[in-house]
Design a protein with these regions (language model features):
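Short, small-residue-biased leader/transition segments that mark boundaries at the very start
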Residues: 3-5
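Active-site or pore-adjacent capping/gating segments
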Residues: 140, 144, 151-215, 219, ...
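Long, distal/terminal scaffolding or interaction modules
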Residues: 174-175, 186, 199-203, 212-215, ...
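Glycine-rich beta-to-alpha transition loops that act as phosphate-gripper elements at the mouths
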Residues: 49-54, 114-127
Length: 551
């Protein structure tokens, strides 16, 4: 139950791990994500992990231009126990290839001093670390070695909650077997450092910084004549490009400047809300301003300051911003409880990404002549990865609406393809048509979809969900309350029509419910009826579900 709270998921319901990053389809999307993350924590150094592959150097250059401070090159032989075994043994390339290409590409593009390069994947000795440094790495990641030092026996059952050494399990009986101590890790790292020091001494190098990029100290070992290894040409791997005025080390002075001081959050929101923000208990306050589609991640910086000072404790609508115009990409990303953004206009992609308790309201200007419920007002990938909060959209959303939503509540008047994909929690109400592949990979949460043409079943992915009529009094009450709140927030004519004729529209709604989620909720309810408290009921239901699946 602790893990599920952390992951905003449901006890006993399986998750796809790792979930696909449906907010990244190009280097531009990645650049936007880096910008969003920087806005959400201005003090953070953004680290981007790239898998070693042919062409990774080009991607690394794009990542550096986008403002990342650390690029991690990860190889194929890492020891993760949660990945499929065929991936562990058959997918990927050695970290040496990707590391060398990324390092060389950054030097040739004059970007090497902007970023630190990290390498990982089975760095098991000082020799491995020395080679990584000579190929361009400045930082090094260790996973398998420290785990083995703590007692891991590489059973590769990390995802099954059956770790015999008590390391990767929530089972209290198995956790009693854990014998690891912090001193074991300290000893491992000390011996690793000593091994590295000995190699450096033999090479005549005094510091790790001096070792970075020194491919001239590496020599290709001769392979037996006629062997496959003898046919390999490693010249490119050991190439040491010398570009004028280009460093081979990270320089903090060359870090990318995002210009966050010029954003509306810093110029307007932080100043206008300052008086209320400085109070121990802020008084509700509303401001109005114009926004444009170049104002990316609007509200994110101010939201991060709210989180830093108040956490998620502020009442709804404490800080209310009425925006007129066009919301840029990632409008309202990551905003916390207490912050409400009301947009009179439309918004670009990623609206409400990572919504964390705040409220988003979007509707067209009152004087529009088109049918609001048939026009797109927000772009693709809205509410991606939302964990809490509310969103009311008077209009149609683009594709991949509420992907990996795990706790937010949303009302919208139509969505594109792949709506509610990989959703694990929360509630979504769709007062219009959906695109194809709705609810693919949806393992939690509930969606209510208005099916006026009785053809929704042709567009839903039925692998993990079932369609039911909305009949239970709890569902009817919740649906009606959410539509009412939607109308109050946006003035939606479509929502008002449905409310005024609710008895007529109710039979046309379909409830989308994941199979395992439904089973788990029923088991938890049964345990609570037996007198178990909520937490214990979840634990008992989890093991009941697990035992049933093992039979």
């Amino acid at each position: 139950s602790e893990m599920c709270i952390r992951d905003s998921s449901t006890t006993g319901v399986g998750l796809i791990s790792p979930p696909p990053h449906h907010d990244i389809y190009s280097i531009e999307d990645l650049a936007q994500l880096i910008y969003d993350l920087k806005c959400s924590n201005r003090k953070a150094a953004i680290n981007v992990k790239l898998v070693s592959e042919a062409g990774v150097g080009t991607i690394a250059a794009g990542v550096a231009k986008a403002g990342a401070e650390v690029i991690l090159i990860s190889g194929f032989d890492g020891g993760t126990g949660a990945a499929p075994r065929n991936s562990i043994h058959n997918a990927g390339l050695p970290w040496e290839l990707g590391l060398a290409e990324a390092h060389q590409s950054l030097i040739m593009n004059g970007l090497r001093s902007r970023v630190r390069i990290e390498a990982d994947s089975k760095l098991m000795s000082g020799r491995d670390v020395a080679i990584a440094a000579m190929l361009g790495a400045e930082e090094f990641g260790f996973g398998t070695g420290p785990l083995v030092a703590m007692g891991c026996v590489m059973m590769r059952v990390c995802n099954l909650d059956t770790c015999p050494m008590g390391i990767c399990t929530q089972n209290p009986e198995l956790r009693k077997r854990f014998k690891g101590k912090p001193e074991y890790i300290i000893n491992f790292m000390r011996f690793m450092a000593e091994d590295l020091r000995e190699y450096m001494a033999r090479l005549g190098v005094h510091t790790v910084d001096e070792l970075v990029g020194r491919t001239d100290l590496l020599k290709v070992k001769d392979a037996p004549a006629g062997s496959r290894a003898s046919e390999m040409d490693l010249t490119a791997l050991l190439k040491n490009p010398l570009v004028e005025n280009s460093s081979v080390h990270f320089n903090a002075k060359d870090v990318y400047n995002f210009g966050l001081e010029k954003t509306p959050d810093m110029r307007v929101l932080m100043k206008k809300f300052k008086k209320s923000f400085d109070m121990a208990e802020p008084k509700p306050m509303t401001i109005e301003l114009e926004v444009g589609n170049t104002d990316r991640a609007f509200g994110t910086i101010f939201g991060s300051e709210i989180t830093r000072k108040f956490g998620n404790t502020l009442p709804e609508d404490t800080f209310h911003v009425i925006c007129n115009g066009y919301g840029g990409q990632s409008f309202g990303a990551f905003i916390p409880a207490g912050l409400t953004l009301e947009l009179v206009g439309d918004s670009n992609d990623y609206m409400g990404k990572g919504l964390s308790g705040g409220k988003l309201i979007v509707y067209p200007p009152k004087d529009v002549t088109y049918d609001r419920s048939e026009n797109i007002v927000i772009g693709n990938v809205a509410l991606y990865g939302a964990t809490a909060g509310k969103a009311f959209i008077n209009g149609v959303a683009g594709e991949r609406f509420c992907v990996r939503n795990s706790g937010a509540t949303a009302v919208v008047e139509g969505v594109g393809d792949h709506g509610c994909e990989y959703m694990t929690g929360g509630t979504v109400v769709v007062l219009g048509k959906t695109g194809k592949n709705f609810a693919a990979g949806m393992s939690g949460g509930i969606a209510y979809v208005l099916d006026e043409d009785w053809d929704f079943y042709t567009r839903v992915n039925k692998d993990m969900v079932s369609l039911e009529p909305v009949e239970h009094k709890y569902d009817v009450s919740l649906l009606k309350d959410l539509i009412r709140e939607h109308v109050e927030a946006t003035g939606s004519p479509r929502g008002k029509e449905i409310l005024d004729n609710f008895g007529e529209y109710l039979p046309k709604f379909k409830k989308v419910l994941p199979h395992d989620y439904d089973k788990m909720l029923r088991l938890i309810a049964q345990m609570e009826e037996k007198g178990e408290d909520s937490e214990q009921a979840q634990i008992e239901a989890f093991y009941a579900m697990k035992n049933a699946s093992n039979k």
